[in-house]
UniProtKB/Swiss-Prot annotation:
One Gene Ontology cellular component: extracellular region
Disulphide bridges, residue numbers: 3-19, 6-24, 10-26
Species name: Mesobuthus eupeus
Coiled-coil region(s): none
GO molecular function, one term: ion channel inhibitor activity
Localization of this protein: Secreted
Annotated protein name in UniProt: Potassium channel toxin alpha-KTx 9.10
Main location: secreted
Free-text domain note: Has the structural arrangement of an alpha-helix connected to a beta-sheet by disulfide bonds (CSalpha/beta).
Family: Belongs to the short scorpion toxin superfamily. Potassium channel inhibitor family. Alpha-KTx 09 subfamily.
């Protein structure tokens, strides 16, 4: 998942979307 889709990708998972080197991470 790219950075642009990260917030939507992490939505509903009660996580904070972060982006490192173009990689989306959903951090609780």
């Amino acid at each position: 998942v790219g950075c642009e889709e990260c917030p939507m990708h992490c939505k509903g998972k009660n996580a904070v979307p972060t982006c490192d080197n173009g990689v989306c991470n959903c951090n609780a």
